[in-house]
């Protein structure tokens, strides 16, 4: 059930001063094994009065094998000296050449096979932003990491360096199987305001819990808010052992790097013009995320504390920034009808002076294309009443109506007079 691991470098060094061709040599080897310390292999060997010869090194192949041939009879120290990122190495160990055949105690095995087991720590990262619409809304990132199959675990931490466009809000840490862990006792959460990095590090007590529950996973949820537009990429680092803490990401023996996830934010630019194409100013717009809200003018989008956006530029342009991409949610592309897809509605709540208010909302989307420089939407207004001055607003038309009214009244009077005369 084990998976071969290529790319692991092993070094083999003979312990000098122990002669395994004699019974006393085997006794000395047994004594050394009793005091051998995997945490300090060289020190425990030299402390027992022995030395180590120059070593030879090999890297495991695609089958996870490294074969050291031609070794003389003796006791050897075997260590992993290099291994892929995200891998917790097996502890150093002593092995003798030859070994007693476990199936035939009267026989020696000179072809020795050992199977050191490495712990591979994999990790994933996801983003949840489908419910986010405008800058200031919450976007959450979830890091899920395996636990090293090692005991003891000498170090374990997760670091998420947040993009400057993200503001840290809070973080929680749990084990996927529900095993209880407590902040402060089993782990710490530190947010560095200078680097915007969030670090979750397990204490000795917490690492003991991890070692005892290494078939579950560590889950870190980080809540942020978005403060600026952009395609904001994010990934996390999982350091599976103490040695990995001092190794750069991507280097052998370094941390596991999660896949990168993104949350994408942008805007659009509107050009306000009259029927002849001349730029207009003074229009005021609101933005909504549903047709019902747009019709009722309820729940408008709020950006930088404003729910209304006025065209003040002389060229009639208005840029509305700070909206999530319509076609990208929860780290993936979405299409109309998919969960997380955003259809926006632009509603004119004040028309330019002398122009009619738009009769209906205008649908629009926010994408990488609309966020790029340039005009994305041209909105045309028509003059009041199509340019014709209605009565009571001044001009010749009013005078005509007044005269017609007088004529009607006069005609009425004549009619009455005539009628009365006829009845006289």
Mark where each language-model region is.
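Solvent-exposed loop/turn and edge beta-strand elements of beta-rich ligand-binding domains
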Residues: 1-424
């Amino acid at each position: 059930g084990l998976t071969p691991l290529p790319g692991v470098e092993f070094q083999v060094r003979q312990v000098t001063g122990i002669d395994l061709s004699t019974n006393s040599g085997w006794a000395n080897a047994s004594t050394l094994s009793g005091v051998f310390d995997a945490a300090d292999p060289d020190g425990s060997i030299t402390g027992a009065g022995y030395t180590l010869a120059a070593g030879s090194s090999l890297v495991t192949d695609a089958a996870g094998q490294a074969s050291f041939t031609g070794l003389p009879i003796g006791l050897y120290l075997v260590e992993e000296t290099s291994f892929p990122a995200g891998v917790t190495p097996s502890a150093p160990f002593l092995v003798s050449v030859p070994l007693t055949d476990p199936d035939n105690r009267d026989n020696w095995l000179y072809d020795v096979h050992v199977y050191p087991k490495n712990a591979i720590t994999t990790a994933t990262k996801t983003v949840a932003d489908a419910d986010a619409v405008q800058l200031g809304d919450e976007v959450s990132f979830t890091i899920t990491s395996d636990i090293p199959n090692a005991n003891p675990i000498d170090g374990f931490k997760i670091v998420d360096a947040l993009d400057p466009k993200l503001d840290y809000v809070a973080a929680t840490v749990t084990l996927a199987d529900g095993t209880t862990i407590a902040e402060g006792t089993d782990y710490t959460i530190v947010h560095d305001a200078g680097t915007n990095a969030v670090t979750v590090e397990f204490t000795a007590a917490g690492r003991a819990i991890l070692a005892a529950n290494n078939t579950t996973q560590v889950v870190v949820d980080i809540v942020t808010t978005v403060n600026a537009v952009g395609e904001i990429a994010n990934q996390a680092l999982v350091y599976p052992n103490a040695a990995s803490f001092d190794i750069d990401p991507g280097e052998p023996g370094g941390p596991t790097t999660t896949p990168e996830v993104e949350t994408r934010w942008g805007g659009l630019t509107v050009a306000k013009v009259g029927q002849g194409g001349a730029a207009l100013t003074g229009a005021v717009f609101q933005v909504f995320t549903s047709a019902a809200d747009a019709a009722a003018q309820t729940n408008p989008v709020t950006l930088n504390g404003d729910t209304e956006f006025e065209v003040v530029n002389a060229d009639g342009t208005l840029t509305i920034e700070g909206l999530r991409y319509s076609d990208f949610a929860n780290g993936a592309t979405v299409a109309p009808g998919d969960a997380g897809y955003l259809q926006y509605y632009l509603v004119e709540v004040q028309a330019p002076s002398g122009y009619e208010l738009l009769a209906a909302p205008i649908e629009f989307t926010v994408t990488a294309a609309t966020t790029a420089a340039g005009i994305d939407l041209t909105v045309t207004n028509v003059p009041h009443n199509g340019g014709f001055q209605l009565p009571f607003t001044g001009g010749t038309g009013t005078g005509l109506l007044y005269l017609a009214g007088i004529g009607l009244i006069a005609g009425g009077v004549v009619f009455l007079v005539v009628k009365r005369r006829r009845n006289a």
